[in-house]
Amino acid sequence: MPSGVPLIDIVRRAVRRWTSLPRKGFTIRTYNLCFLGFGNVNRTLAQLLRDRKQELCDSHGISFRITGVATRRLGWIADPNGLDLAHVGRTLLSDKSQEPNRDPLTVRNWLQAAQADILFEATSLNVNNGQPAADHIRAALNHGAHAITANKGPIVHAYRELRDLAAAKGKRFLFESTVMDGVPIFSFFHQMPTIHLQGFHGILNSTTNVILSEMENGLSFDAALKKAQQLGIAETDATHDIDGWDAAVKTAALITVLMDVPVKLEDIAREGIRELTTNAVRNGRRDGWPFKLVCRAQRVGNGVKASVAPEKVLSSSPMGRVSGTSSYIYFETDLFPGLAITEENPGLYATAYGMLADFVRAVS
């Protein structure tokens, strides 16, 4: 050992030299990425991909270029050599050299023009039939691309078909961002072989949680909804949230995938928060039993009994402590009596991260 040089410094130098050497067999592959829907989620994902670009390359051997962007309003553009996202919005609107194609046939054609390896699907939820998102995913898999979505509809209405199609094509159909943003619920259970999920309960809709909190503070339902909309938490049309549809779709997705029991939305007993009064909500909080919109599912024989409804929960319980835009879920399995996950006030980056993580899983 050189005189006067601490051992830790020698180790650090050795590590730096080792990590700077080319890794044997470490092949970097470039993937063509396409974004279908370019609203908040996919825009945030694009930013996150840029932020993590070097790390993806260094740690996972993943390089990428964005070769296609499509929106319902503006049509689509594709360039297999790569698009400059900083100019995509202007290109969609005005650049005649890459004028967006609005042919309704064409998700498959667009993917072919972009030479897509990955589709990131983030279009609006259709609770009735999961369309057109299910067709988008079907087109991607038939084209030969991995399909990654943040849309819950295809999971509820076409999961087994799309899963089997992906397997037949040797591709991945992944959807981690559909429930609790980017929390890895589906991949978590995928890593638990032979575990059997018996049931779950939790709070999976953040909009109703915020509205109920504002009602506890004395606002009427309408005023609380308006405040949530002004904060950007509730949509202009918040029907899916306040009438329990969003929570029911998430419940159905969890049952379908994790319990392997296909369930229709009409099979889930559903009640929203629209009928709750400010007095009832305030009194519940005062008495230590606040209202929450609770999702429940329990295996019964070969089926599952499921519900979404406002319930009074003990304020000191895990569900009672959920506030703001946070979420909570508790799983009962045959071997683990209870597994709980809490997500604290996630933002768009959490949802985007779930899609990025699915990308890494798909190509690894």
Predicted regions and their residues:
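Rossmann-fold NAD(P)-binding glycine/threonine-rich loop
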Residues: N126-A139, K152-F175, F188
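N-terminal glycine-/serine-/threonine-rich beta1-alpha1-beta2 phosphate-ribose binding loop
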Residues: V11, G25-N142
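Substrate-binding/catalytic subdomain of NAD(P)-dependent oxidoreductase enzymes
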Residues: E214, L225-R321, S326
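Conserved active-site and cofactor/substrate-binding residues in soluble primary-metabolism enzymes
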Residues: L36, N40, T44, F64, ...
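Rossmann-like NAD(P)H-binding beta-loop-alpha module
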Residues: A167-A234, W245-D246
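ATP-dependent carboxylate/acyl-activation modules
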Residues: P318-S364
